[in-house]
Amino acid sequence: MRNAKIVCTLGPASDDAETIRSLADAGMSVARLNASHGSTDHRRTVIDRVRDVDDELTEPLAVMVHLKGPEVRTAEIDEPVMLETGSEVVFAKGDTSTPEFVGLTVSITECEPGDTILLDDGRIEAHVRRVDGEEVVAEIISGGKLQSRKGVNIPGVDLDIELITEGDERELELAADKQADFVAASFVRDGEDVYKIIDKLEEFGDADIPVIAKIERAGAVENLDSIISAADGVMVARGDLGVECPLEDVPVVQKRIIKKCVDAGVPVITATEMLDSMIHSRRPTRAEASDVANAVLDGTDAVMLSGETAIGDHPVRVVETMADIVNGVEETDEYAESVEQRVPSAKDQSRTEALARSARYLARDIGASAVVAASESGYTARKTAKFRPQVPIVATTPNERVRRQLGLVWGVIPRSLEYQESVEHILEGSVQAALDANAAESGDTVVAISGLVSNIDQAQTTNMLKVHVAAEQIASGKQIVGGRVAGPLVRLTDGDLSDVPEGAILSLSTAFDGEFTGDIEKIGGIVDAREGMTGYPAVIARELGIPMLSGAIVPDRIAEGQTLSIDAERGVVFEGNVLRTPRR
């Protein structure tokens, strides 16, 4: 069970149904669709494929539509163009490029003499000499071959470009129509840009899609607090940051962004060239493995693969490798120590955060196996994850979209659960989900936390924190004698107690109509299939003061000798010993 999740970019190498399923089996939690490539109609088809795969899985598989944004690229050309070092080149809006003229998708006349123009992730560098009307004249400082449609960065220059392009509007309409789980916004400058995306989604009828803000400009780093406050998540685009900012600053900026996001309880994705060599190689470099490991140690919610899975030679192997690296790091003492030392504070006057933080330390102090969160909207689960408990967070929700969205959140195992009857029933179902997910074993202690639940009669229980024993309920009945006891099951047919072990739980069928012979002191508890409070077994139970239920049938699948627990006050029988000391 990994804490850090994996986001995979789908492309020509991976967007068929079979490969999507294989990627999910290998560890993909979120499928990213990059609108910078391909068509909107094709993305519509791929979303349907992802949904079909999600329907087949226990673990959630979410869809992220990543907007192209107001990017600046060079013109589309058939053959590379050589830009010679020392030559003078004109940059202007246009659809062609030559050694003397570089066509761009937008005008960059906001430049001033002395500004730097970087092409193709900084591989080609030019310095602006002058601006003549709509043309920017620059000297090539570091030349090279310019390929088709390469990115253009101008550090420190705020170009007058609309945040949401016509193409972005089509993608946002698609996201709303197909109920995408996330929208990632490129070139976000501040919190206001995030709100513009949300407003546009609302126009298209779905303002509930979480917006992930991609941090890729120096200005965005300066406005990080407002972006984190406005966004539902953050993506650290190290590649673009490495062009916009001094290269030596990027590792520290990455750590700063991750820490701020964790402190705010906002999911953060670490992206760009994490296993880039595996686009063609079957093994990553040692530096790449260290890069992934350090992001995990920093506390990132997710690590992202781009070209490695979109156009790589073996996308599934890349995901398997990423999962192996993450798992390896998370199993170390260094990782556990790092998590323990970085627990953020709860916000002032936030009841949910105070309870979530308490759940984290309560789970640690009592040796709980999991934190179980009943989280209809996902809010309580996300807040619980903020405090990074050292055990899995099993979050249940009746909302399938929320289930998929929680697949991006650190340490959360999301499960579907229909909410009905009462908060207590919801918690019981959530604990059972933890058992089914192998996050806890029968008899383990778990910490249960619940947020406000709508459409429930007892919804006044807005936030609740309790210690709970995780066990599979196998029978229920009416209390005859109270108490709690655990012992080996004995199915008694004739009343003979001579071979009954000490502390046995007697299961009596509806056909039992005799009396006990032998040492009745050996009986630990009684589960009687017959209704009634005055029969012979009830008399014995009262005489001995041992727990007893009536009208409770132990299923045939439970073998003799297997340990059962009776909780007579609650009227239930559990499989296993729920009274034992919790494991640590």
Where do the PLM segments sit?
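C-terminal helical cap(s) of enzyme catalytic domains, especially alpha/beta-barrels
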Residues: 46-54, 309-332, 463-466
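Active-site mouth loops of central-metabolism enzymes
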Residues: 2-15, 68-70, 76, 92, ...
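Nucleotide-binding motor/catalytic cores of P-loop/tubulin-like NTPases across gene-expression machines
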Residues: 293, 380-382, 389-420, 524-526, ...
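Acidic, glycine-rich flexible loop/linker segments
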Residues: 72-165, 169, 439-445, 449-495, ...
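Hydrophobic faces of well-ordered beta-strands that scaffold small-molecule active sites
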Residues: 4-10, 31-33, 63-65, 183-185, ...
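Short beta-strand/loop segments at the ligand-binding rim of alpha/beta enzyme cores
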Residues: 1-8, 58-64, 147-161, 201-216, ...
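Conserved alpha/beta-domain cores
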Residues: 8-14, 42, 163-272, 278, ...
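Conserved, mostly hydrophobic/aromatic
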Residues: 9, 23, 34, 66, ...
